[in-house]
Design a protein with these regions (language model features):
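Juxtamembrane intracellular "pre-TM" segments in multi-pass secondary transporters
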Residues: 183-220, 316-320
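Short amphipathic helix-loop junctions that connect adjacent transmembrane helices
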Residues: 1-12, 235-255
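Helix-to-loop junctions at the C-terminal end of transmembrane segments
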Residues: 28-42, 265-279, 300, 305, ...
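Intracellular juxtamembrane helix-capping segments at the cytosolic ends
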Residues: 89-102, 342-355
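Multi-pass alpha-helical transporter architecture, strongest
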Residues: 62-63, 170-181, 300, 396-425
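C-terminal ends and interior cores of transmembrane alpha-helices
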Residues: 49-70, 289-322
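Cytoplasmic membrane-interface "Motif A"-like loop-to-helix N-cap segments
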Residues: 37-52, 275-291
Length: 425
């Protein structure tokens, strides 16, 4: 969006608006969809439709060259809003398969391994894009192609835009093992209208029984706030890095590779922490780390380190990350990637520990609501703060507050100890 719009501050504002609209759509539909699918039984048919839609929307972003998009900016914003909504539905349906596939005892490790594996694939993809499309023609290394493969035109942003087609293709191919190998729930005898009415009744009953489900509802309230903060970091982190550090495609690919490697460690770390200290304490530690590091990120820039001016020389003559602020920013971003990935995995595991087993689908519907339907809040705060402050750093400042509020609410959640202790209790 920075290249398509031409202004990083405006780009951050427009992306915030798109995610806000997508979040509103999910808020109105996700819990009822989760409850209805719970009544129908199988999740995979719905998941297949969501994945197919995601693939098409992501691929459509190919038509956004920086020199006059084939799609108008309004259409691009609508596509991003659609991706936001579809990803939320995907998360809900995918998470509802976690416990049937891995069981209660294996949910934590499976969740962490899944995120670690996904980020490992991301590393391979980003390195491939770097070697095939970003570096050729920019550095004189003999082992590289002389120009981007397939004759892609840099003037039209094609080496950047090809990533949308690659991501869409990998998503389609990567979904095949899930549909082939992961077990699904048995189909009920209910028709779609009957499941809709029964699911609506389940949600109404859940609201009526709020006192009986107070503990998981407190957790979901906490997650609603801190996940908004984490989602804002994920959505705007790339825009923020490109804007405040003045990074182009080459640097952003290197940044993405580094963060993906760090995220692999985060996924593996989550599984270990969930088993040894329990997912609740794990989430607390991960959020505390996020709050500290995200605050430090606000003090970074091309000419400043941790809120202090910097004007030193280059550290080396390489193609990217040649200054101390860039190296420090890279390190802080890596810690954020570790903590965010671990927090996502641990919070997903925590819900499987505190939610009633027979209401898992409904609570995962509410889980998506707490993490995605209120995505309008994070983007709205970022959009408003960016407009008022006039800088990207001001725009990201509310994120720290969301993380802190979520951590405070999490203190009131019971349970979430290591599985052996919880079973014994």
């Amino acid at each position: 969006m920075t290249r398509v719009i031409g202004d990083p501050v405006l780009g951050q504002t427009l992306v915030a608006s798109a995610n806000k609209w997508g979040g509103w759509a999910v808020m109105l539909t996700a819990p009822l969809l989760g409850a209805m699918v719970d009544r129908l039984g199988p999740r995979k048919p719905w998941l297949a439709g969501v994945v197919a839609t995601l693939v098409m929307l992501i691929a459509a972003l190919w038509f956004t060259p920086p020199t006059g998009a084939a799609l108008p900016h309004g259409a691009v914003i609508a596509i991003i809003a659609g991706i936001t909504a579809m990803f939320a539905y995907h998360e809900m349906l995918h998470n509802a398969l976690l416990r049937p596939a891995a069981g209660m005892a294996g949910a934590g490790r499976a969740s962490g391994l899944a995120l670690a594996g996904g980020n490992a694939v991301s590393v391979v993809l980003l390195v491939t894009i770097l070697v095939a499309f970003a570096l050729p023609g920019k550095v004189g290394w003999n082992w590289l192609p002389a120009a981007p493969l397939f004759g892609l035109d840099r003037a039209l942003g094609e080496p950047d835009r090809i990533t949308t087609l690659i991501v869409a293709g990998i998503m389609a191919v990567g979904a095949i093992p899930l549909f082939h190998r992961v077990p699904d729930m048995a189909r009920s005898a209910l028709s779609l209208p009957q499941a809709f009415r029964a699911g609506a009744g389940d949600l109404a009953q859940l609201v009526r029984e709020a006192r009986g489900h107070r503990n998981p509802l407190i957790f979901l309230a906490a997650r609603m706030i801190f996940t908004d903060g984490m989602t804002a970091i994920l959505v705007f982190g790339g825009l923020y890095a490109a804007g405040v550090m003045h990074w182009g495609m080459l640097e952003m690919l290197g940044y993405g590779i580094t963060l993906s490697i760090a995220a692999v460690a985060g996924g593996l770390l989550a599984g270990v922490l969930d088993d040894r200290i329990g997912p609740k304490l794990a989430v607390k530690l991960e959020l505390a780390l996020l709050i500290i590091v995200q605050t430090l990120v606000l003090g970074m820039g091309r000419d400043r380190i941790l809120f202090q001016p910097w004007s030193g020389p280059k550290l080396w003559d390489g193609p990217m990350f040649t200054t101390l602020p860039e190296i420090v920013f890279l390190g802080l971003g890596s810690v954020l990637a570790i903590a965010i990935t671990a927090a996502y995995a641990s919070s997903r595991t925590l819900l499987t520990r505190v939610a009633p087993p027979d209401k898992m689908g409904v609570f995962f519907g509410l889980y998506v609501l707490s993490g995605s339907a209120t995505m309008w809040l994070g983007p709205l705060l970022v959009e408003s703060a960016t407009r008022l402050g006039g800088t990207q750093a001001w725009g990201m400042a509310p994120v720290v507050g969301m993380l802190l509020i979520g951590l405070v609410i999490l203190m009131f959640v019971r349970g979430g100890e290591p599985i052996a202790r919880q079973t014994a209790g």
